[in-house]
């Protein structure tokens, strides 16, 4: 497994994918190869050339060849995905509809399509079409039964406590982030790190392993490294591979203590305090106390607690002490575990980790 952790390789994606053990990755993230339709040089109003997507990697002889290629790599990516893994693909009107068709036929389960709206798109200089101001992202789980990762609360926090929508606005990659050599772009479709940050933060957890089969100049690996995720990337083009390798080596990970994210509320099944008493996890007669150890209470056989003349649930007694209508007793009360003092919520979490 270590062979595929935090490494990138220069080679053919299909050939390398076939060497990877099944169920290796938590997430696949692919910026799609396309069939370019530009066909000839475009001119800006000042008569300078428009750098369309004319890279060698962007050329296929026919739709048939492209379809065969897509089915092959999608099947291989499905094989190397863990059962609860998911896949993101990023594309344009040139290819996203074809790839969506193949994603469903291969057996993935569609979760969302997301619109990346560019607030600084390249204009349509000929004035013959609408300005192409967006790209489409498809997010799908390995199967209908997959318990995929979706960090709902973190996304809501990112969006000022509003549900994150499926239309995202980011600028195209520019400024210092855009890789250039001799004043020219190293890669014509380098994605902005902000876009990948949202994808990776929303659908993976710390230490998850991410595969990018078409790495380009390494944006997926760079963002994965920053966010404490592991990565494996494949890139066929030697120029892009070299640029990605240099870029990844220069990237510094965010300090681990800052990588904590909000947990989803739905991920915590309800466990009554009385259940912990019934199961012997905490015994009747145990002394519990507040964080400063100034207030004490005793646990009764039915899961209630007594503090002086007050008796009731851990929540009601805590609320009465605090002078409020309600209070979270799980975080108010502490107990001794060995030589440590821990909130009683730790006992609940220990129970959940063993039984859920």
Protein language model regions, located:
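S-adenosyl-L-methionine
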Residues: 2-17, 246-271
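Core catalytic lobe of class I
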Residues: 1-232
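Conserved acidic E/D residue at the C-terminus of a beta-strand in Rossmann-like folds
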Residues: 235
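Class I S-adenosyl-L-methionine
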Residues: 100, 104, 242-245, 249-252
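Acidic/polar loop patches that form or flank catalytic/metal-binding clefts of enzymes
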Residues: 148-151, 256, 328
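Intrinsically disordered, charged low-complexity linkers and terminal tails
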Residues: 226, 230, 238, 243-246, ...
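Short alpha-helix boundary/capping motifs
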Residues: 105, 131, 227, 251-253, ...
């Amino acid at each position: 497994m270590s062979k595929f952790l935090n490494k990138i390789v220069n080679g053919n994606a299909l050939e390398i994918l076939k060497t990877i053990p099944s169920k290796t990755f938590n997430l696949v993230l692919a910026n799609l190869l396309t069939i370019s339709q530009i066909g000839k040089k475009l001119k800006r109003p000042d008569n300078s050339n428009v750098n369309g997507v004319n890279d060698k990697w962007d050329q296929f002889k026919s739709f048939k060849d492209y379809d065969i290629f897509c089915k092959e790599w999608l099947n291989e990516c499905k094989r190397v995905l863990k059962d609860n893994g998911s896949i993101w693909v990023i594309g344009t009107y040139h290819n996203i509809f074809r790839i969506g068709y193949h994603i469903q036929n291969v057996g993935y389960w569609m979760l969302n399509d997301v619109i990346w709206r560019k607030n600084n798109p390249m204009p349509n200089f000929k004035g013959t079409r609408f300005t192409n101001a967006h790209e489409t992202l498809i997010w799908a789980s390995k199967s209908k039964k997959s318990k995929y990762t979706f960090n709902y609360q973190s996304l809501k926090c990112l969006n000022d406590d509003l549900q994150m929508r499926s239309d995202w606005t980011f600028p195209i990659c520019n400024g210092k982030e855009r890789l250039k050599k001799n004043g020219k772009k190293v890669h014509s479709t380098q994605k902005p790190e902000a876009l990948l940050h949202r994808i990776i933060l929303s659908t993976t957890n710390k230490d998850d392993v991410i595969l990018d089969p078409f790495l380009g100049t390494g944006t997926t690996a760079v963002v994965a490294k920053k966010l404490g995720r592991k990565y494996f990337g494949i890139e066929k083009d030697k120029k892009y591979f070299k640029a990605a390798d240099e870029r990844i080596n220069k990237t510094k990970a965010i300090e681990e203590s800052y990588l904590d994210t909000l947990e989803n509320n739905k991920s915590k099944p309800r466990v009554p305090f009385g259940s912990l008493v019934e199961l012997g996890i905490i015994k009747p007669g145990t002394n519990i106390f507040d964080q400063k150890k100034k207030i004490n209470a005793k646990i009764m056989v039915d899961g209630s607690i007594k503090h002086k003349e007050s008796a009731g649930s851990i929540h009601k007694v805590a609320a009465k002490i605090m002078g409020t209508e309600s209070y979270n007793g799980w975080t108010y009360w502490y107990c001794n575990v060995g030589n440590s003092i821990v909130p009683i919520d730790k006992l609940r979490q220990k129970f959940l980790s063993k039984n859920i």
